Amino acid sequence: MKNQFSRRKFLAATGAAVVAPLVIPRSVLGQNGSPGANETIKVALIGLGNRCMDIYPREIKPVAGLKIVGVSDFWTVRMKSFFDKSPNDLQPEQAYADFREMIDTEKPDGIFAMTATHQRAWVTGIAMQMGCHVYIEKPMCLTIEEGR
């Protein structure tokens, strides 16, 4: 059987291997202030209602390599309830009424937006403009216009 590996294929494969390090984004390697693949990812929770109380202890808190750096809810009664009911490592000084202040102070890599549907587009839009990755559940917004 004839060898199907030609000089052309060899040069193409070698060229790709040489060029790959030049085109891989620095963020993948953990440079420019973003976390690398093996570093802890800092996240924040926005909206501390029933959905958060359901998801946080089961799905978010147990994830290895994930650190909750702050929580935000404009309703202080809900924040108090979060700290009373949820076993967590957070301190009350990491709780913010204004999520923008929390993002500015704590500098999370991403947020979990568990707000009411009518608030999601606004909250996630601002968080993304501030440089955060966003986890959001459906529906993302109420109308097509709101999502644009």
Which role fits each region the language model picked out?
Residues 140-148:
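Rossmann-fold NAD(P)-binding glycine/threonine-rich loop
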Residues 48, 139-140:
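Active-site loop/turn elements of alpha/beta-hydrolase fold enzymes
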